[in-house]
């Protein structure tokens, strides 16, 4: 039920919509991650991919909102669908709280929507679940669906936003004031040459988080590199929660997905710090998985290199730990800097 803490009745993420000038490449990425290509929209050139509770829409419309979004940004997350108890109630409540409504003639999809980060759209979806959802009502079966062996990714754990310097508080307040997100972490992260600050917000229903990143110092940091390539603020990465990250990476071995390189010295001490890790340590080293935690639990995570434009994917497995890998920030940041050096940015 909607409440003071959850004023719009938010219940989680229903879908992520992608727009891209290179449809074939995006399709291959989805397949390599274990998504099945199942359905197409009845009226639009939009294809539906699924893996467990992660739903992707790949928009190939030549005109309209997502087409223009891709022209502006390149490969992009043009919209998301967020689950709510009542879509019209959530939409009206969001607008009353200061959100900008999206007009019907602007949208590619027929659901109530507001503008979100970087003028992407947030649709409000109140039909979801196994028996009654938008994929049964608004989509139809493909003549030749592609059923892929899933890779163990069960839901979107978090999605990270990159914003211009001086606007982090604005976007933090957007999520807090309109949806009821709460701040759960603040980070000030330094690498060898660059730095950033980050707020992490949790949705009022507790189902997902949105960290917001802002660069520090000169414009060569990873956040400002993203903003330049993407032409504005937007979603930097999605994090897939895995039920077994080692098994997921074993299943993806040999695919097109490349992950960041971690210096071998990282593993000299990590298992002394976290002796409770039960996963195969040789496989952790082989896949260059990062590990972080405390006496109560730990998490395992890995990051791809930039996959589509400046956007990448994180894979995370949580074992009684709700953090973001704070203990790995220095190693991760320096790995990203090495990748920036390789690409001539630093």
Curated annotation (Swiss-Prot):
Keyword Cytoplasm assigned to the entry: answer is yes
- The record lists the membrane-crossing segments as none
The protein's required cofactors: Fe cation
Q: Which family does it belong to?
A: Belongs to the 4HPPD family.
Under InterPro entries, the record lists:
4OHPhenylPyrv_dOase, 4OHPhenylPyrv_dOase_C, 4OHPhenylPyrv_dOase_N, Glyas_Bleomycin-R_OHBP_Dase, Glyas_Fos-R_dOase_dom, VOC
Pfam families referenced in this protein's UniProt entry, alphabetically: Glyoxalase, Glyoxalase_5
Give the protein's recorded name.
Protein MelA
């Amino acid at each position: 039920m909607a409440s003071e803490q959850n004023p719009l009745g938010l219940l989680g993420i229903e879908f992520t919509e992608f727009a891209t000038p290179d449809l074939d490449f995006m399709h291959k990425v989805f397949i390599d991650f274990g998504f099945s290509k199942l359905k197409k929209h009845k009226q639009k050139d939009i294809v539906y991919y699924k893996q467990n509770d992660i739903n992707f829409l790949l928009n190939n419309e030549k005109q309209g909102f997502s087409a223009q979004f891709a022209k502006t940004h390149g490969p992009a997350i043009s919209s998301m669908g967020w689950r709510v108890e009542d879509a019209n109630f959530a939409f009206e409540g969001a607008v009353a709280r200061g959100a900008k409504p999206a007009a019907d003639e602007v949208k590619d999809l027929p659901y109530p929507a507001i503008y979100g980060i970087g003028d992407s759209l947030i649709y409000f979806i109140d039909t979801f679940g196994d028996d009654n959802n938008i994929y049964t009502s608004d989509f139809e079966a493909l003549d030749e669906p592609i059923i892929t062996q899933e890779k163990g990714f069960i839901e979107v754990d978090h999605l990270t936003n990159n914003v211009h310097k001086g606007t982090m508080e604005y976007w933090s307040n957007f999520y807090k004031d309109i949806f009821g997100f709460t701040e759960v972490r603040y980070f000030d992260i330094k690498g060898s040459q660059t730095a950033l600050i980050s707020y992490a917000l949790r949705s009022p229903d507790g189902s997902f988080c949105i960290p917001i990143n802002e660069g520090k110092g000169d414009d060569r940091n990873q956040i400002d590199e993203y903003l330049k390539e993407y032409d504005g603020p937007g979603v930097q990465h999605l994090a897939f929660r895995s039920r077994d990250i080692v098994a997921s990476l074993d299943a993806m071995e040999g695919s097109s997905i490349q992950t960041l390189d971690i210096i071998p010295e990282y593993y000299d001490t990590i298992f002394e710090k976290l002796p409770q890790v039960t996963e195969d340590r040789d496989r952790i080293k082989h896949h260059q998985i990062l590990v972080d935690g405390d006496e109560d639990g730990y998490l395992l995570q890995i990051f791809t290199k930039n996959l589509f434009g400046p956007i990448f994917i994180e894979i995370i497995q949580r074992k009684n730990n709700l953090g973001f890998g704070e203990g790995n920030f220095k190693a991760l940041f320096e790995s990203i800097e090495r990748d920036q050096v390789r690409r001539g940015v630093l």
